[in-house]
Amino acid sequence: VALVTDEHVAAHYLQPVAESLRKAGFDVLEVVYPGGEGHKNLSGAEGIFAQLIEAGLDRSAWVLALGGGIVGDMAGFVAASYLRGVPYVQVPTTIVAQVDSSIGGKTGVNHALGKNLIGAFHQPELVFVDTDTLRSLPRGELVAGMAEVVKHGIIRDAELFSFLEDRIEEITEMSIGADALDWLIARNAGIKAAVVSADEKEGGVRAILNYGHTIGHAIEAATNYTRYRHGEAVIFGALAVGEIAAQQGVLAPDVRMRHDALWKRLGVPQGLASVQAEAILQRTRADKKRVGN
């Protein structure tokens, strides 16, 4: 098993997970890389490939992704590409990974011209979730991860949306009880799994999962993946989509009010005014979902 994680997650969970695997009879290759969007690229993947090749891993090997969404994307891409594909397992440790990115088989790395432009669909054999890992996350990471949860409530689940209106602060402060947290993660994972099952390769309904992401990804690219977490950029994107929908008359004023209020309670990052609108618009033209001109 190639156990792939980043430096931050390794400090918390690498040795317990590696030891557990060894006790179960697995040979474990520990692969630790710097992490972050700035290393989620072909150069970063090349470093992981080199370690797998040097260790002599063959097609019977598995890759285990231990960490957040970036680790899952990177390790999944490596698994999809190494020897034309080996099995992999997702062990997500952040909200965004547990409710969204670990489910559905999207893997990929960034290019200087856009986010996730190089990748493959490669389904994990297993997704193993331990919600206790969420309680060690800094608040900023929790807020960013909750962007995907709010998104699910908006696009698919009125009951979930109402739950978030009642308890969003409990979640971001991690004062929420264990049972409620387990329900929240399971509910969201179920939403993502249902959409993906209906449209694995994003030819139709799966596109709704990109709510707020077209503009969000463009903001990330326009700021060189250094200013905002992914979820923070999605918050901007969702608010922009709400404005566009309202202008087009497809979002009722009362729903718009609830929509914007929940995003603002989650927390809108600062500093976007310094980013040129044209730079953001230009990045949307390189979006992987773009059709035609």
Give residue spans per PLM region.
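C-terminal charged capping/lid subdomain of soluble metabolic enzymes
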Residues: 2-6, 147-150, 250-293
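Internal helical hairpin/lid segments
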Residues: 214-258
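Short glycine/serine/threonine-rich phosphate/pyrophosphate-binding segments
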Residues: 12, 70-77, 98-99, 217-218
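ATP/NTP phosphate-donor binding region
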Residues: 1-62
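A generic, well-ordered mixed alpha/beta core segment in the N-terminal half of proteins
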Residues: 63-66, 70-84
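Residue-level signal for inorganic ion chemistry
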Residues: 3, 41, 92, 130, ...
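A glycine/threonine-rich phosphate-anchoring loop and its flanking beta-alpha core
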Residues: 77-169
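Oxyanion-binding "anion nests"
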Residues: 168-227
